[in-house]
Amino acid sequence: MAALSDTAASHAFHPPARTTYLVLILCFLTIVAEGYDIGVMGTIVPSLLADANWKLTPIEIGAMGSAALFGTLIGSYFISVVSDLVGRKLLLIGCVTLFSLSMIGAGCAPTPWVFSVARFIGGLGLGGVISAAAALTIEFSPPEKRNLNFALMYSGYSFGALLSAVIGMAFLGSHGWRFVVALGAAPLLAVPFLFYMLPESLDFLIARGRHEKAAALARKLGIAPAELERNVRDPLPKPSVGAVFREVFSKQNALATISLWVAQVAAVMVIYGLGTWLPQLMRKMGYDLGSSLSFLAVFMLSSALGGILIGRISDFLGTRKTIVGGYVIGAIAISSLAIKSGLIMNYVLVALAGFGSIGVAMVQLGFIANYYRAHARASATGWAVGVGRFGAMSGPMVGAYLASRGADVQWNFYAFAGSALVAAVAIALTRSPHWSSASMTAGAISLKS
Protein backbone atom coordinates (compact mmCIF):
# COMPACT_ATOMS: atom_id res chain seq x y z
CA MET A 1 0.00 0.00 0.00
CA ALA A 2 1.10 3.50 -0.62
CA ALA A 3 2.39 5.56 2.18
CA LEU A 4 0.65 8.69 3.30
CA SER A 5 2.25 12.02 3.97
CA ASP A 6 1.37 15.66 4.07
CA THR A 7 1.37 18.00 1.12
CA ALA A 8 5.13 18.16 1.12
CA ALA A 9 5.12 14.81 -0.60
CA SER A 10 3.11 16.01 -3.58
CA HIS A 11 2.83 19.26 -5.50
CA ALA A 12 -0.34 21.24 -4.84
CA PHE A 13 -1.85 21.27 -8.33
CA HIS A 14 -5.34 22.68 -8.73
CA PRO A 15 -6.89 20.77 -11.63
CA PRO A 16 -10.42 21.47 -12.83
CA ALA A 17 -13.15 19.36 -11.27
CA ARG A 18 -13.60 17.25 -14.40
CA THR A 19 -9.99 16.07 -14.20
CA THR A 20 -10.25 15.29 -10.50
CA TYR A 21 -13.44 13.28 -11.01
CA LEU A 22 -12.01 11.41 -14.00
CA VAL A 23 -8.89 10.32 -12.12
CA LEU A 24 -10.88 9.52 -8.98
CA ILE A 25 -13.37 7.33 -10.84
CA LEU A 26 -10.71 5.44 -12.81
CA CYS A 27 -8.57 4.85 -9.73
CA PHE A 28 -11.63 3.85 -7.68
CA LEU A 29 -12.48 1.21 -10.30
CA THR A 30 -8.97 -0.24 -10.20
CA ILE A 31 -9.27 -0.57 -6.42
CA VAL A 32 -12.66 -2.25 -6.86
CA ALA A 33 -10.89 -4.77 -9.11
CA GLU A 34 -8.21 -5.30 -6.47
CA GLY A 35 -10.86 -5.79 -3.79
CA TYR A 36 -12.56 -8.42 -5.92
CA ASP A 37 -9.26 -10.25 -6.46
CA ILE A 38 -8.49 -10.43 -2.74
CA GLY A 39 -12.07 -10.85 -1.52
CA VAL A 40 -12.95 -13.68 -3.89
CA MET A 41 -10.90 -16.11 -1.81
CA GLY A 42 -13.30 -15.79 1.10
CA THR A 43 -16.21 -16.22 -1.30
CA ILE A 44 -14.97 -19.54 -2.69
CA VAL A 45 -13.57 -21.15 0.49
CA PRO A 46 -16.74 -23.22 1.15
CA SER A 47 -16.72 -24.43 -2.46
CA LEU A 48 -13.01 -25.27 -2.37
CA LEU A 49 -13.50 -27.33 0.78
CA ALA A 50 -16.34 -29.18 -0.94
CA ASP A 51 -14.36 -29.81 -4.16
CA ALA A 52 -14.11 -33.60 -4.43
CA ASN A 53 -11.26 -33.43 -6.94
CA TRP A 54 -8.86 -31.44 -4.77
CA LYS A 55 -9.83 -32.75 -1.29
CA LEU A 56 -8.28 -29.76 0.45
CA THR A 57 -7.66 -29.45 4.18
CA PRO A 58 -8.22 -26.18 6.08
CA ILE A 59 -4.45 -25.69 6.40
CA GLU A 60 -4.05 -25.97 2.62
CA ILE A 61 -6.91 -23.50 2.13
CA GLY A 62 -5.22 -21.09 4.52
CA ALA A 63 -1.93 -21.35 2.64
CA MET A 64 -3.69 -20.77 -0.67
CA GLY A 65 -5.41 -17.73 0.81
CA SER A 66 -2.08 -16.32 1.95
CA ALA A 67 -0.36 -16.80 -1.42
CA ALA A 68 -1.63 -13.56 -2.97
CA LEU A 69 -0.89 -11.65 0.24
CA PHE A 70 2.67 -12.97 0.26
CA GLY A 71 2.94 -11.75 -3.32
CA THR A 72 1.86 -8.26 -2.28
CA LEU A 73 4.57 -8.28 0.40
CA ILE A 74 7.26 -9.13 -2.15
CA GLY A 75 5.88 -6.84 -4.84
CA SER A 76 5.63 -3.84 -2.56
CA TYR A 77 9.40 -3.71 -2.16
CA PHE A 78 9.83 -3.09 -5.90
CA ILE A 79 7.04 -0.54 -6.30
CA SER A 80 9.09 2.62 -5.84
CA VAL A 81 11.81 1.39 -8.21
CA VAL A 82 9.36 0.49 -10.97
CA SER A 83 7.39 3.70 -10.44
CA ASP A 84 10.54 5.79 -10.81
CA LEU A 85 11.32 4.02 -14.08
CA VAL A 86 7.96 3.87 -15.87
CA GLY A 87 5.71 6.33 -14.01
CA ARG A 88 2.57 5.87 -11.97
CA LYS A 89 0.21 5.48 -14.92
CA LEU A 90 2.10 2.61 -16.55
CA LEU A 91 2.72 1.03 -13.14
CA LEU A 92 -1.02 1.02 -12.45
CA ILE A 93 -1.90 -0.38 -15.87
CA GLY A 94 0.81 -3.03 -15.64
CA CYS A 95 -0.32 -4.13 -12.19
CA VAL A 96 -3.98 -4.34 -13.25
CA THR A 97 -2.98 -6.41 -16.27
CA LEU A 98 -0.82 -8.76 -14.19
CA PHE A 99 -3.35 -9.55 -11.48
CA SER A 100 -6.19 -9.85 -14.00
CA LEU A 101 -4.26 -12.42 -16.04
CA SER A 102 -3.43 -14.27 -12.84
CA MET A 103 -7.16 -14.68 -12.17
CA ILE A 104 -7.48 -16.58 -15.44
CA GLY A 105 -4.60 -18.79 -14.35
CA ALA A 106 -6.17 -19.41 -10.94
CA GLY A 107 -9.58 -20.14 -12.44
CA CYS A 108 -8.09 -22.69 -14.85
CA ALA A 109 -5.57 -24.16 -12.38
CA PRO A 110 -5.38 -27.98 -12.61
CA THR A 111 -3.90 -28.34 -9.11
CA PRO A 112 -3.87 -26.39 -5.84
CA TRP A 113 -0.16 -25.71 -6.39
CA VAL A 114 -0.80 -23.99 -9.74
CA PHE A 115 -3.67 -22.06 -8.14
CA SER A 116 -1.35 -20.80 -5.40
CA VAL A 117 1.39 -19.83 -7.86
CA ALA A 118 -1.13 -17.88 -9.95
CA ARG A 119 -2.40 -16.12 -6.82
CA PHE A 120 1.16 -15.28 -5.78
CA ILE A 121 1.92 -13.78 -9.20
CA GLY A 122 -1.28 -11.78 -9.00
CA GLY A 123 -0.21 -10.56 -5.58
CA LEU A 124 2.91 -9.04 -7.13
CA GLY A 125 0.61 -6.80 -9.15
CA LEU A 126 -1.75 -6.12 -6.27
CA GLY A 127 1.15 -4.69 -4.31
CA GLY A 128 1.39 -1.78 -6.74
CA VAL A 129 -2.22 -0.97 -7.56
CA ILE A 130 -3.15 0.86 -4.37
CA SER A 131 0.15 2.75 -4.36
CA ALA A 132 -0.19 4.09 -7.90
CA ALA A 133 -3.95 4.70 -7.69
CA ALA A 134 -3.67 6.57 -4.41
CA ALA A 135 -0.75 8.67 -5.62
CA LEU A 136 -2.62 9.73 -8.77
CA THR A 137 -5.84 10.41 -6.86
CA ILE A 138 -4.04 12.66 -4.39
CA GLU A 139 -1.97 14.47 -7.01
CA PHE A 140 -5.00 15.40 -9.10
CA SER A 141 -7.16 16.43 -6.13
CA PRO A 142 -7.17 19.96 -4.71
CA PRO A 143 -5.51 20.03 -1.26
CA GLU A 144 -8.78 20.64 0.58
CA LYS A 145 -10.35 17.51 -1.01
CA ARG A 146 -7.46 15.09 -0.60
CA ASN A 147 -8.71 13.46 2.61
CA LEU A 148 -12.18 12.88 1.18
CA ASN A 149 -11.02 11.71 -2.23
CA PHE A 150 -8.51 9.30 -0.71
CA ALA A 151 -11.25 7.80 1.48
CA LEU A 152 -13.60 7.48 -1.51
CA MET A 153 -10.89 5.89 -3.65
CA TYR A 154 -9.83 3.46 -0.91
CA SER A 155 -13.44 2.42 -0.24
CA GLY A 156 -13.29 0.69 -3.61
CA TYR A 157 -11.54 -2.23 -1.91
CA SER A 158 -14.57 -3.01 0.22
CA PHE A 159 -16.93 -2.57 -2.71
CA GLY A 160 -14.80 -4.99 -4.75
CA ALA A 161 -14.90 -7.60 -2.01
CA LEU A 162 -18.65 -6.98 -1.71
CA LEU A 163 -18.97 -7.57 -5.45
CA SER A 164 -17.18 -10.92 -5.12
CA ALA A 165 -19.71 -12.02 -2.49
CA VAL A 166 -22.68 -10.90 -4.61
CA ILE A 167 -21.33 -12.67 -7.70
CA GLY A 168 -20.66 -15.73 -5.57
CA MET A 169 -24.28 -15.80 -4.42
CA ALA A 170 -25.42 -15.52 -8.04
CA PHE A 171 -23.08 -17.97 -9.77
CA LEU A 172 -21.32 -20.32 -7.35
CA GLY A 173 -24.18 -22.79 -7.27
CA SER A 174 -24.71 -22.86 -11.04
CA HIS A 175 -21.25 -22.20 -12.50
CA GLY A 176 -18.80 -23.20 -9.77
CA TRP A 177 -15.87 -21.47 -8.13
CA ARG A 178 -13.67 -21.45 -11.26
CA PHE A 179 -16.10 -19.18 -13.08
CA VAL A 180 -16.30 -16.78 -10.13
CA VAL A 181 -12.50 -16.57 -9.94
CA ALA A 182 -12.05 -16.14 -13.70
CA LEU A 183 -14.46 -13.19 -13.69
CA GLY A 184 -11.68 -11.36 -11.88
CA ALA A 185 -10.02 -10.99 -15.29
CA ALA A 186 -12.74 -8.57 -16.43
CA PRO A 187 -10.56 -5.49 -15.67
CA LEU A 188 -8.50 -6.41 -18.74
CA LEU A 189 -11.34 -4.87 -20.75
CA ALA A 190 -10.65 -1.53 -19.04
CA VAL A 191 -6.92 -1.43 -19.85
CA PRO A 192 -7.36 0.41 -23.21
CA PHE A 193 -9.49 3.05 -21.47
CA LEU A 194 -6.84 3.50 -18.78
CA PHE A 195 -4.20 4.03 -21.47
CA TYR A 196 -6.34 6.60 -23.24
CA MET A 197 -8.05 8.46 -20.37
CA LEU A 198 -5.77 8.28 -17.32
CA PRO A 199 -3.17 11.08 -17.18
CA GLU A 200 0.44 10.47 -16.20
CA SER A 201 1.72 11.95 -12.98
CA LEU A 202 2.98 15.51 -13.48
CA ASP A 203 5.28 14.97 -10.51
CA PHE A 204 6.86 12.04 -12.35
CA LEU A 205 7.31 13.99 -15.59
CA ILE A 206 8.87 16.92 -13.72
CA ALA A 207 11.21 14.64 -11.78
CA ARG A 208 12.34 12.99 -15.04
CA GLY A 209 13.04 16.36 -16.65
CA ARG A 210 10.32 15.91 -19.27
CA HIS A 211 9.12 19.48 -18.89
CA GLU A 212 7.67 19.90 -22.39
CA LYS A 213 5.49 16.82 -22.01
CA ALA A 214 4.46 17.97 -18.53
CA ALA A 215 3.49 21.39 -19.93
CA ALA A 216 1.46 19.83 -22.75
CA LEU A 217 -0.36 17.55 -20.30
CA ALA A 218 -1.02 20.44 -17.91
CA ARG A 219 -2.59 22.46 -20.74
CA LYS A 220 -4.75 19.49 -21.71
CA LEU A 221 -5.89 19.03 -18.11
CA GLY A 222 -6.57 22.72 -17.56
CA ILE A 223 -3.82 23.28 -14.98
CA ALA A 224 -2.43 26.81 -14.90
CA PRO A 225 1.08 27.15 -16.43
CA ALA A 226 2.19 29.18 -13.40
CA GLU A 227 1.57 26.20 -11.11
CA LEU A 228 3.66 23.93 -13.29
CA GLU A 229 6.49 26.45 -13.58
CA ARG A 230 6.58 26.91 -9.81
CA ASN A 231 6.81 23.17 -9.25
CA VAL A 232 9.53 22.77 -11.88
CA ARG A 233 11.60 25.32 -9.95
CA ASP A 234 10.83 23.56 -6.65
CA PRO A 235 11.09 19.77 -7.19
CA LEU A 236 10.01 17.41 -4.43
CA PRO A 237 12.72 16.56 -1.89
CA LYS A 238 13.65 12.91 -1.35
CA PRO A 239 14.46 12.17 2.31
CA SER A 240 17.27 9.71 2.96
CA VAL A 241 16.64 6.32 4.54
CA GLY A 242 18.85 7.36 7.43
CA ALA A 243 16.77 10.45 8.15
CA VAL A 244 13.58 8.39 8.11
CA PHE A 245 15.10 5.75 10.39
CA ARG A 246 16.22 8.37 12.90
CA GLU A 247 12.73 9.85 12.99
CA VAL A 248 10.91 6.52 13.29
CA PHE A 249 13.20 5.05 15.94
CA SER A 250 14.17 8.19 17.80
CA LYS A 251 14.08 8.12 21.59
CA GLN A 252 10.73 9.91 21.51
CA ASN A 253 9.14 7.73 18.80
CA ALA A 254 10.59 4.23 19.22
CA LEU A 255 7.94 2.86 21.60
CA ALA A 256 5.16 4.53 19.65
CA THR A 257 6.46 3.02 16.42
CA ILE A 258 6.38 -0.46 17.95
CA SER A 259 2.83 0.14 19.21
CA LEU A 260 1.70 1.36 15.80
CA TRP A 261 3.25 -1.65 14.08
CA VAL A 262 1.58 -4.02 16.55
CA ALA A 263 -1.75 -2.30 15.89
CA GLN A 264 -1.27 -2.58 12.15
CA VAL A 265 -0.44 -6.30 12.28
CA ALA A 266 -3.34 -7.05 14.62
CA ALA A 267 -5.86 -5.03 12.62
CA VAL A 268 -4.89 -6.52 9.27
CA MET A 269 -5.00 -10.02 10.79
CA VAL A 270 -8.66 -9.47 11.67
CA ILE A 271 -9.47 -8.05 8.23
CA TYR A 272 -7.96 -10.85 6.18
CA GLY A 273 -8.82 -13.59 8.65
CA LEU A 274 -12.53 -12.76 8.63
CA GLY A 275 -12.44 -11.87 4.94
CA THR A 276 -11.21 -15.38 4.16
CA TRP A 277 -13.12 -17.50 6.67
CA LEU A 278 -16.36 -15.65 7.51
CA PRO A 279 -18.58 -17.48 4.96
CA GLN A 280 -17.26 -20.88 6.07
CA LEU A 281 -17.66 -19.98 9.74
CA MET A 282 -21.27 -18.97 9.15
CA ARG A 283 -21.88 -22.23 7.31
CA LYS A 284 -20.67 -24.06 10.39
CA MET A 285 -23.12 -21.97 12.39
CA GLY A 286 -25.91 -23.59 10.34
CA TYR A 287 -26.46 -21.20 7.40
CA ASP A 288 -26.57 -22.35 3.77
CA LEU A 289 -24.07 -21.16 1.15
CA GLY A 290 -26.18 -18.23 -0.05
CA SER A 291 -26.80 -16.91 3.43
CA SER A 292 -23.17 -17.36 4.45
CA LEU A 293 -22.03 -15.30 1.47
CA SER A 294 -24.57 -12.61 2.32
CA PHE A 295 -22.76 -12.17 5.65
CA LEU A 296 -19.54 -11.45 3.75
CA ALA A 297 -21.42 -8.92 1.62
CA VAL A 298 -22.72 -7.15 4.73
CA PHE A 299 -19.24 -7.21 6.28
CA MET A 300 -17.71 -5.49 3.26
CA LEU A 301 -20.52 -2.99 2.70
CA SER A 302 -20.45 -1.84 6.33
CA SER A 303 -16.67 -1.47 6.20
CA ALA A 304 -16.83 0.73 3.10
CA LEU A 305 -19.45 3.04 4.55
CA GLY A 306 -17.93 2.79 8.02
CA GLY A 307 -14.54 4.06 6.94
CA ILE A 308 -16.04 7.31 5.69
CA LEU A 309 -18.29 7.65 8.76
CA ILE A 310 -15.44 6.97 11.19
CA GLY A 311 -13.34 9.61 9.47
CA ARG A 312 -16.08 12.14 10.14
CA ILE A 313 -16.47 11.01 13.76
CA SER A 314 -12.73 11.36 14.36
CA ASP A 315 -12.94 15.02 13.37
CA PHE A 316 -15.13 15.59 16.44
CA LEU A 317 -13.85 13.07 19.02
CA GLY A 318 -10.20 12.87 18.05
CA THR A 319 -8.53 10.20 15.95
CA ARG A 320 -6.99 8.07 18.70
CA LYS A 321 -10.17 7.86 20.79
CA THR A 322 -12.20 7.02 17.71
CA ILE A 323 -9.84 4.25 16.62
CA VAL A 324 -9.71 2.68 20.09
CA GLY A 325 -13.48 2.86 20.47
CA GLY A 326 -14.00 1.44 16.98
CA TYR A 327 -11.80 -1.58 17.63
CA VAL A 328 -13.54 -2.23 20.96
CA ILE A 329 -16.91 -2.17 19.19
CA GLY A 330 -15.52 -4.52 16.55
CA ALA A 331 -14.14 -6.91 19.18
CA ILE A 332 -17.47 -7.04 21.04
CA ALA A 333 -19.37 -7.67 17.80
CA ILE A 334 -16.99 -10.38 16.60
CA SER A 335 -16.99 -12.23 19.92
CA SER A 336 -20.79 -11.96 20.08
CA LEU A 337 -21.03 -13.91 16.82
CA ALA A 338 -19.94 -16.93 18.84
CA ILE A 339 -23.29 -16.82 20.63
CA LYS A 340 -26.19 -18.35 18.72
CA SER A 341 -28.51 -15.52 17.66
CA GLY A 342 -31.20 -14.83 15.11
CA LEU A 343 -30.48 -13.95 11.49
CA ILE A 344 -31.13 -10.21 11.85
CA MET A 345 -28.98 -9.93 14.97
CA ASN A 346 -26.12 -11.73 13.23
CA TYR A 347 -26.37 -9.32 10.30
CA VAL A 348 -26.11 -6.42 12.75
CA LEU A 349 -23.10 -7.99 14.48
CA VAL A 350 -21.34 -8.65 11.17
CA ALA A 351 -21.98 -5.06 10.10
CA LEU A 352 -20.46 -3.79 13.35
CA ALA A 353 -17.52 -6.14 12.82
CA GLY A 354 -16.87 -4.59 9.40
CA PHE A 355 -17.25 -1.12 10.88
CA GLY A 356 -14.83 -1.98 13.69
CA SER A 357 -12.17 -3.63 11.55
CA ILE A 358 -11.69 -2.43 7.96
CA GLY A 359 -13.49 0.86 8.60
CA VAL A 360 -11.29 1.69 11.58
CA ALA A 361 -8.13 0.50 9.82
CA MET A 362 -8.70 3.09 7.07
CA VAL A 363 -8.60 5.87 9.67
CA GLN A 364 -5.65 4.22 11.41
CA LEU A 365 -3.52 4.74 8.30
CA GLY A 366 -4.10 8.46 8.51
CA PHE A 367 -3.26 8.42 12.22
CA ILE A 368 0.04 6.67 11.52
CA ALA A 369 0.84 9.05 8.68
CA ASN A 370 0.31 12.14 10.77
CA TYR A 371 2.29 10.78 13.71
CA TYR A 372 5.64 11.51 12.07
CA ARG A 373 7.13 14.74 10.81
CA ALA A 374 6.80 15.64 7.15
CA HIS A 375 10.24 14.55 5.93
CA ALA A 376 9.70 10.96 7.15
CA ARG A 377 5.94 10.59 6.95
CA ALA A 378 5.59 8.84 3.61
CA SER A 379 8.30 6.24 4.18
CA ALA A 380 7.40 5.69 7.84
CA THR A 381 3.81 4.90 6.95
CA GLY A 382 4.96 2.63 4.15
CA TRP A 383 7.08 0.69 6.63
CA ALA A 384 4.09 0.28 8.96
CA VAL A 385 1.95 -0.96 6.09
CA GLY A 386 4.69 -3.38 5.05
CA VAL A 387 4.89 -4.81 8.56
CA GLY A 388 1.10 -5.12 8.55
CA ARG A 389 1.29 -7.52 5.62
CA PHE A 390 2.53 -10.17 8.04
CA GLY A 391 -0.88 -9.87 9.69
CA ALA A 392 -2.50 -10.24 6.28
CA MET A 393 -0.67 -13.51 5.68
CA SER A 394 -1.23 -14.88 9.18
CA GLY A 395 -4.96 -14.05 9.37
CA PRO A 396 -6.08 -16.80 6.96
CA MET A 397 -3.67 -19.23 8.62
CA VAL A 398 -5.17 -18.63 12.08
CA GLY A 399 -8.57 -19.75 10.85
CA ALA A 400 -6.98 -22.68 9.03
CA TYR A 401 -5.08 -23.82 12.12
CA LEU A 402 -8.15 -23.71 14.37
CA ALA A 403 -10.18 -25.63 11.80
CA SER A 404 -7.45 -28.26 11.40
CA ARG A 405 -7.36 -28.79 15.17
CA GLY A 406 -11.09 -29.39 15.25
CA ALA A 407 -11.73 -26.35 17.43
CA ASP A 408 -15.31 -25.19 17.85
CA VAL A 409 -16.26 -22.40 15.47
CA GLN A 410 -16.61 -20.02 18.42
CA TRP A 411 -12.85 -20.00 18.96
CA ASN A 412 -12.32 -18.40 15.56
CA PHE A 413 -14.45 -15.45 16.60
CA TYR A 414 -12.70 -15.23 19.97
CA ALA A 415 -9.29 -15.26 18.28
CA PHE A 416 -10.14 -12.45 15.86
CA ALA A 417 -11.89 -10.46 18.59
CA GLY A 418 -8.76 -10.76 20.69
CA SER A 419 -6.69 -9.45 17.80
CA ALA A 420 -8.98 -6.41 17.53
CA LEU A 421 -8.51 -5.76 21.25
CA VAL A 422 -4.73 -5.96 20.81
CA ALA A 423 -4.99 -3.26 18.13
CA ALA A 424 -7.12 -1.11 20.46
CA VAL A 425 -4.65 -1.42 23.34
CA ALA A 426 -1.68 -0.70 21.07
CA ILE A 427 -3.25 2.53 19.80
CA ALA A 428 -4.31 3.51 23.32
CA LEU A 429 -0.70 3.14 24.51
CA THR A 430 0.63 5.36 21.73
CA ARG A 431 1.67 8.74 23.08
CA SER A 432 1.00 12.00 21.31
CA PRO A 433 3.70 13.07 18.80
CA HIS A 434 6.67 14.77 20.46
CA TRP A 435 6.63 17.53 17.85
CA SER A 436 4.06 20.34 17.89
CA SER A 437 0.58 19.36 16.83
CA ALA A 438 0.34 22.73 15.16
CA SER A 439 2.62 21.34 12.48
CA MET A 440 0.21 18.62 11.56
CA THR A 441 -1.65 18.98 8.31
CA ALA A 442 -5.15 17.87 9.11
CA GLY A 443 -6.65 18.98 5.86
CA ALA A 444 -4.38 17.32 3.34
CA ILE A 445 -3.13 13.83 2.86
CA SER A 446 -0.96 12.80 -0.02
CA LEU A 447 0.74 9.63 -1.03
CA LYS A 448 4.09 8.78 -2.41
CA SER A 449 4.61 5.47 -4.10
Q: What kind of feature is each model-predicted range?
A:
Residues 1-449:
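Transmembrane-helix signature of 12-pass secondary carriers
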